[in-house]
Every structure is written in C-alpha cells, then in structure tokens.
C-alpha cells in the first residue's frame, strides 16, 4: 500500500505518463484551474495540406506565465492525429507515444533548466487526414497550478489531391 501511494503521488518530473494521453489530466491530485489559461496556442496559418507540416507555438501571455510541464496533442474529435517533431537540442521536451510513435509532446526532466515562457514544435498532418484539427495542450505552471486541454483555434487540413 505504501508503494502504490508513493507511486500515485509522484509529480511526473520526467514527462506525462501514457495514462494521461486520453483525458490529458496530470496525476497531481489537485483540481485544474477554473479561470481561462494565461497561455495562447498559435499557428502561422489556418489551413495546411495533408502531409504538410505546421509550426505550433505555445506562449504565456506575460513573462510570469511560464510552463514547467506540458502535454500537447493534435485532435480531430477525440482522435489523436499527426506526428510531432522536437528539435534535437530541445532540453525541455520529448516525444510521447499516445498510441502511435511521436503523436504527442511532453516535458522531460529539466532540473537544471528554467521553466519556459514559449515553446514551439513542428506538427505534420498524416497524408490521408482531412477536416479540422484542434491542438490541445495541458500546461503545468507548478504542481498545484495547471490547465487541462487548452484548445487552439481549428486548423483546416486540406486534401493533398
């Protein structure tokens, strides 16, 4: 019993567990914030062709709105779609397998680095994908302060034919 209690109370300093993939809720035993998130998710365009890539940026609205942890996914309805690219020198982020390799991004252990105010990743739409996609991110500011599945504006995926 004490081992399971210890395991359940861990703060996932090495990234979100795959058990968080669907509901995007961190296992912090605290309630998510009820006020709107002080973060925005932006893309340079509102439409992209299937098979193409788009940069997705998550930013705090002020310098105090930093991120200690994230879980980022692209969703079409409830389905996680597409794949992500994390820069090789990124000391904050890593890919997560939420049913498919590289279809989510999470934080990694970063004890010696600072929390981030802005992060960007490249997302690639699958070649067969069509319709609207929404980027959703769970953002952890600290153990007790987090927002779950903050949505972006929809991005339209156009047929590559």
Curated annotation (Swiss-Prot):
Provide the leader sequence positions: 1-11
What keywords sit in the KW lines? Antibiotic, Antimicrobial, Disulfide bond, Glycoprotein, Immunity, Innate immunity, Secreted, Signal
Keyword Glycoprotein tagged: yes
InterPro entries found in the cross-reference section: Ferric-chelate_Red/DefProt (IPR051237), Reeler_dom (IPR002861), Reeler_sf (IPR042307)
- Indicate the principal place this protein occupies in or around the cell: secreted
The source's superkingdom equals Eukaryota
Give a single Pfam family match.
Reeler
GO BP term, pick one: defense response to bacterium
Any idea where this protein resides?
Secreted
- CDD domains, per the entry: Reeler
Q: Which cysteines are joined by disulfide bonds?
A: 21-98
Family (UniProt): Belongs to the insect defense protein family.
What is known about what this protein does?
A: May have antimicrobial activity.
Q: What is this protein called?
A: Putative defense protein 2
Q: Which species is the source of this protein?
A: Antheraea mylitta
